[in-house]
Amino acid sequence: ERGITLSGGQRQRAALARALLADAPILILDDALSSVDNQTATQILRNLSEGTRRKTVLFISHQLSAAASADRLFVMDQGKIVQSGTHAELIAQTGLYQTLWDKQKLEEILQ
């Protein structure tokens, strides 16, 4: 950092930029949006979508709205895959994804 103090969100954005510049065919993002606000997260996701069209992206997140646009979602509970499908398919099912989605949407409304 050499005398420059970066916030958590700034560090995350810098790490994400480095990962994208590496131009690897597979990109693994583990909770890459945890330190950024919702507006910044939306912008990052839009840019990621455009910048990773021909790549495999494994996007790990507890923020379901960030993962909703993925081609395929895998829902894990206690280390096991309990559901998989698109966002629309998982919302239509009664299960963990639908429960978590409803809870997160309610939390967003209350904030």
What are these regions (language model features)?
Residues E1-I4, Q10-R13, Q39:
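Conserved ABC ATPase nucleotide-binding domain "signature" region
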Residues S7-G8, A14-A19, F59:
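ABC ATPase nucleotide-binding domain "signature" region
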Residues L21-P25, R54:
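A short, proline-enriched helix->beta-strand linker immediately N-terminal to the Walker B motif
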Residues L27-D31:
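Catalytic Walker B motif of ABC-type/P-loop ATPase nucleotide-binding domains
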Residues A32-V36:
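ABC ATPase nucleotide-binding domain "signature" loop
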Residues A41-R53, S65:
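Helical segment within the ABC ATPase nucleotide-binding domain
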Residues R46, A68-Q111:
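C-terminal portion of ABC ATPase nucleotide-binding domains
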Residues R54-S61:
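Conserved H-loop
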